[in-house]
Amino acid sequence: RSRGLGDVYKRQVLNNKIIKNLKKHSSKEKYLLSSVKPNHQKFEEKRYWRGPVWINCNWIIYKGLKNKNIKFAQQIKRKTINLVKQKGFNEYFSCKTGKGFGATNFSWTAALFLDLILENKND
């Protein structure tokens, strides 16, 4: 059975090897987390699921990381919030420039951005 990003969130299947790979994958990226490593031969900066940053993926990974590596989770959260603040509610973004692509005023970007910034406000 293959495991998708949903499993990362629902079952918290993150282990140290996965976290290490995520850190390595993101270490040279200004905007986290690209859907394909920028140095991979299949990387395409503007093409669906071939390289862009997706806020929904960052959100799922952040939620899965919170109980495993809070420092890295907070880095993803902070960079995701900053990306949306700077570039807007686009569907997806360049991992190199942060430029938004796809639909503008995209609802899942807006909803997940709100979830991230409002988290812990009522605690």
Residue map of PLM features:
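Single conserved hydrophobic/aromatic residue that forms the stacking wall/gate
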Residues: 1-9
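Non-catalytic carbohydrate-binding regions of carbohydrate-active enzymes
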Residues: 14-113, 117-123
